Amino acid sequence: MKKYLLYASLLTSVLLFSCSKNNPNEPVEDRSIEISIRVDDFTKTGEAVRYERNQGSAAERLITNLYLLLFDQSGANPAKYYITGNTFTGGTWLPDDMKVKLDMTQSEAGERKVYVVANVDNAVKTALDAVANESDLQTVKRTTAMPWSTDIASPFLMSGNKTHDFLANRLLDNVPLVRAIAKVELNISLSEKFQIVPIIVNGSLSEFKFRYVNFDKETYVVKPTTKPDNLISSANGVWPQITDWTVWGASLNTSPAPDAGTGYTLDANGKVTALRIVTYLNERDSKGATVEVALPRVDDGTLPPPEFGPELYRLPLPDKILRNHWYKYEVEI
């Protein structure tokens, strides 16, 4: 009899414990929701580089503010949160954990289409404030009059999205923030016919020049299905008219070197042996973006002018320039 009483007592304890586990003080569906984010790596590719990932520098991963939009299942009625500090109306931002804790509960949230936008300027914020539907995000953009480095610079506009059922899990984990810009790196090794002793003025190579051709001015929060062109070049002069082209600078020769700029290498005799240029640019759906470089030739006296004058090297960029891609080229001229 004692054995049966002991068994009944143990069974009662287990049932009571089970009931307490299934009935916490606050119902599961009423717990506040959380969203964690991460900055996506660059996709690094190019003619002489295998496909790889690169997380980028600290400046390329920098987040200064966030704008959250939680649309309902139909893509409408967004709940919005603008975050500039650790606390904000409606929640808390934990930058070390890359996590946002919202006061909104699971039952209030339900299933949501969640968009996270980072590094929002005043113009983009005003446009996001007016967003009523998910499709409206494709109209929100930042315009840069000179869309290359140093005007396109950190902190970069980023965005990411996921659909999530907060009733099933109060944590939406790892929303990837993707930079809305691309990066181009061009490393040029010069053959002997271009290895001159240059005229250097304030660190720049006076005879070496370049220009960006058909770069797009618009940086979209969410890229339209087909992005319309709004193009500009860094100089109006078309080869061989290079007076207004940019002279080759030495910003990448400094230490620590910036993430974008121009640089060069001199040998022991003071001759230019290599050139380097790194710039950010906006995505494009149509081909035509190009980097043009004017290179002075060594004057060996065998040809009359202008045959030994500058030559043009043209690097066509990919037919489609994709956001968050790092295009790296190693070329010999």
Swiss-Prot record:
Cellular component GO terms held in the UniProt record: cell outer membrane; pilus
Lipidation (N-palmitoyl cysteine): 19
InterPro entries: FimA_N, MfA4_C
Residues of the propeptide: 19-53
Covalent lipid sites (S-diacylglycerol cysteine): 19
Keywords: Cell outer membrane, Fimbrium, Lipoprotein, Membrane, Palmitate, Signal, Virulence
Localisation: Fimbrium; Cell outer membrane
Site (Cleavage): 53-54
Signal peptide residues on this chain, from the entry's feature table: 1-18
Quaternary context: Component of the fimbrium tip. Minor fimbriae are composed of a structural subunit, most often Mfa1, and the accessory subunits Mfa3, Mfa4 and Mfa5. Mfa4 is required for Mfa3 and Mfa5 insertion into the fimbrium. Fimbrium assembly occurs by linear, head-to-tail oligomerization of fimbrial subunits. This is mediated via insertion of a C-terminal beta-strand from one subunit into a groove in the N-terminal domain of the following subunit.
Function: Tip subunit of the minor fimbriae. These filamentous pili are attached to the cell surface; they mediate biofilm formation, adhesion onto host cells and onto other bacteria that are part of the oral microbiome. They play an important role in invasion of periodontal tissues and are recognized as major virulence factors.
Family: Belongs to the bacteroidetes fimbrillin superfamily. FimA/Mfa1 family.
Note: The name (minor fimbrium subunit) does not indicate the abundance of the protein, but is derived from the greater length of the major fimbriae. In strain ATCC 33277 and strain ATCC BAA-1703 / FDC 381, major fimbriae are 300 - 1600 nM in length and about 5 nm in diameter. In contrast, minor fimbriae are only about 80 - 120 nm long. This length difference is observed only in a small number of strains, including strain ATCC 33277 and strain ATCC BAA-1703 / FDC 381, and is due to a loss of function mutation in FimB, a protein that restricts fimbrial length in other strains.
Protein name: Minor fimbrium tip subunit MfA4
Source species of the chain: Porphyromonas gingivalis (strain ATCC BAA-308 / W83)
